[in-house]
């Protein structure tokens, strides 16, 4: 599909764009939201947790952040809040599916209800949000961007994280499937694969020398990542600079998977 509109001088500008970012109350999602805001996007933050810190950080860099409280395991609530966000903002241009949860337990005792919730939050919500975004982009005739947060565990097996691994393997497959179906409409669908990133979810491992030392030794860049390491790649995949990239999963791991 040939791009008919004239290229902007700044390929990375997101001025005038509205970006939905799920799971952005803390950590990686917060870093994504701040990065997009720095490039000019208005952030529509979707999360079940308190988003006040994200709003503050976005506003500190001169951005605008609108908050939507939503349980992403609830499909009816997703539908309601999506339509509210469209109604209040007229258009959405970027979707960042970042919401996720993890439960560590042996597969021998892993509870069915927990498995179902992990899949619902990490994978099913991404499908439902992408479906809504794709229809919205198609109706508007715009080149929308959908970016999914995958993981090292999209290709690794892991231990005691069977639900999470299934959800992240599914996220990679979903990204590829959506990219094939939506490319004819000019919609790009890509994924990020975070490595070991220092967030509240990983702090216990980071602070345990026996666990963190071998991880550091395998990372060529010699350190764990931080949420702000995602700002640049978020802007790239959300902007017209990546208009000929779709179906890709880009590691953000300091070289971990290369080793």
Where are these regions (language model features)?
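Canonical Rossmann dinucleotide-binding motif of NAD(H)/NADP(H)-dependent dehydrogenases/reductases
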Residues: 12-44
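Conserved glycine-rich Rossmann-like NAD(P)H-binding loop of the short-chain dehydrogenase/reductase
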Residues: 41-53
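Substrate-binding pocket helix/loop in short-chain dehydrogenase/reductase
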Residues: 106-107, 111-119, 215
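Active-site helix of classical SDR
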Residues: 130, 167, 175
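Alpha-helical segment proximal to the catalytic Tyr-Lys
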Residues: 135, 180-184, 243
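Residue(s) in the substrate-gating loop at a strand-loop-helix junction
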Residues: 151
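C-terminal substrate-recognition "lid" of short-chain dehydrogenase/reductases
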Residues: 223-252, 256-257
């Amino acid at each position: 599909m040939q791009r008919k509109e004239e290229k902007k001088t700044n390929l990375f500008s997101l001025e005038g764009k509205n970006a939905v970012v799920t799971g952005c109350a803390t950590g990686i999602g917060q870093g994504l939201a701040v990065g997009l805001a720095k490039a000019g996007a208005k952030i529509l933050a979707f999360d079940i947790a308190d988003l006040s810190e994200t709003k503050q950080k976005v506003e500190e860099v001169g951005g605008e952040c609108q908050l939507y409280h939503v349980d992403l395991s609830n499909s009816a609530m997703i539908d309601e809040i999506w339509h509210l966000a469209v109604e209040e903002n007229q258009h959405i241009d970027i979707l960042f599916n970042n919401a996720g949860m993890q439960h560590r337990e042996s597969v021998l005792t892993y509870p069915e209800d927990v498995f179902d919730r992990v899949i619902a939050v990490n994978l099913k919500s991404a499908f439902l949000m992408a479906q809504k975004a794709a229809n919205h982009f198609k109706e508007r005739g715009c080149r929308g961007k959908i970016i999914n947060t995958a993981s090292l565990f999209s290709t690794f097996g892991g231990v005691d994280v069977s639900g999470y691994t299934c959800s992240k393997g599914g996220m990679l497959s979903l990204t590829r499937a959506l990219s094939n179906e939506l490319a004819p409409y000019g919609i790009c669908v890509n994924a990020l694969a975070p490595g070991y990133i220092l967030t509240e979810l990983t702090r216990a491992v980071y602070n345990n020398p026996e666990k963190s030392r071998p991880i550091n030794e395998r990372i060529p860049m010699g350190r764990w990542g931080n949420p702000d390491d995602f700002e640049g790649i978020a802007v790239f995949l959300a902007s017209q600079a990546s208009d000929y990239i779709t179906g890709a999963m880009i590691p953000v791991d300091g070289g971990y998977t290369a080793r």
